[in-house]
């Protein structure tokens, strides 16, 4: 029996964890043809089983597979759709100080969501649920998938598979709804959309580099909102769908900067998720004022503990920031988490596993002091 409450939790996490050395080695061996898929899966299963035990020992109410079966947080999920495959990217994504490997996702047929591998991945984690934990399935948001597949003109020839972006978007929505229906049937009650599309619209330098005018930015906000809400529409009442709004997280570097104000009205006011996991770990994140736009009884998880650096934050400083956020949204609707995952890609951030768990212990300790739970 799973935990009787669902996310977000007062002490929470985004979901990805540093890959153990044994898993990294196995993935390299698989890529080199030294081991087969079954051997890789055996290593993954062992690593995930051990990770779940560590999450429980840390007192977390949410368990994930750490994204241990993925090299990328987003592409690896997209590649699981029918009609989407791996491709070499024409350009590497430039994070600050580093560039990513040259991977992307490309359309190779009509997109659909039947028989995705991630449902079996979820079932493996689901078996470890108990009276204190809920299994979470993370995935790139529908807007993220749409951005990747429409952002590269070579990604899909209109005349071969789709006449226009609207046709492609309709199939993305249908594919997500199929996957979520299958996850729900497998017992999933906590889905998390990870999304870097909104924060690109918050960064003037990114908008300039991509050639987006102010009108383009407003149009893209509406397109993001429409595709996400179309997937969420009419989902079961006991299925919690939250979103992590990310500024990029590759090897302790970042992709975009800027507060949430430019997108707050649409993102916080109109996106029909249950909660937002938001990054507030440094000066690039802006202030808390945009939280006043969070509508209804939606909750906000404050990502005040950075997952990019090993140094532990001062608890009193974090508590003061929580109280500052509570000026814009009631304290009872706030929670605390790490700012992002610890390994959005298999490279992982620049800290050790011990430092990773120390960060989570800090989240737990502060949450208990603030909310008593």
Feature map (PLM): residue ranges:
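Domain-level signal for soluble alpha/beta catalytic cores
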Residues: 1-373
């Amino acid at each position: 029996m799973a935990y009787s409450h669902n996310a977000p939790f007062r002490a929470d996490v985004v979901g990805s964890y540093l890959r153990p050395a044994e898993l990294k080695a196995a993935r390299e061996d698989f890529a080199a043809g030294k081991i087969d898929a079954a051997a890789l899966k055996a290593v993954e299963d062992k690593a995930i089983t051990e990770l779940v035990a560590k999450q429980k020992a840390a007192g977390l109410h949410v368990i994930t597979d750490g994204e241990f079966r993925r090299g990328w947080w987003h592409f690896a999920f997209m590649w699981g759709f029918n009609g989407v495959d791996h491709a070499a990217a024409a350009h590497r994504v430039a994070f600050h100080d580093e560039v990513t490997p040259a991977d992307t996702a490309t359309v190779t047929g009509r997109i659909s969501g039947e028989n995705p591998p991630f449902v079996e991945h979820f079932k493996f984690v689901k078996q470890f649920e108990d009276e204190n934990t809920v299994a979470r399935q993370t995935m790139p948001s529908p807007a993220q998938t749409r951005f990747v597949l429409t952002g590269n003109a070579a990604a899909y020839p209109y005349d071969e598979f789709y006449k226009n972006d609207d046709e492609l978007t309709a199939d993305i929505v249908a594919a997500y709804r199929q996957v979520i229906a299958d996850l729900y049937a497998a017992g999933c009650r906590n889905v998390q959309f990870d999304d870097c599309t909104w924060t690109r619209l918050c960064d003037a330098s990114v908008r300039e580099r991509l050639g987006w005018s102010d009108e383009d930015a407003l149009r893209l906000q509406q397109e993001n909102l429409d595709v996400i809400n179309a997937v969420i529409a009419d989902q079961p009442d006991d299925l919690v769908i939250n979103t992590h709004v990310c500024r990029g997280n590759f090897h302790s570097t970042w992709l975009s900067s800027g507060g949430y104000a430019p997108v707050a009205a649409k993102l916080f006011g109109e996106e029909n998720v249950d909660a937002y996991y938001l990054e507030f770990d440094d000066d690039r994140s802006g202030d808390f004022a945009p939280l006043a736009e969070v509508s209804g009884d939606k909750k906000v998880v404050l990502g005040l503990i950075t997952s990019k650096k090993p140094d532990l934050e001062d608890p009193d400083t974090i508590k003061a920031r929580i109280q500052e956020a509570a000026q814009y949204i009631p304290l009872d609707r706030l929670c605390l988490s790490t700012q992002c995952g610890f390994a959005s890609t298999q490279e992982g951030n620049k800290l050790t596993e011990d430092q990773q768990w120390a960060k989570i212990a800090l989240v737990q300790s502060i949450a208990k002091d603030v909310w008593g739970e």
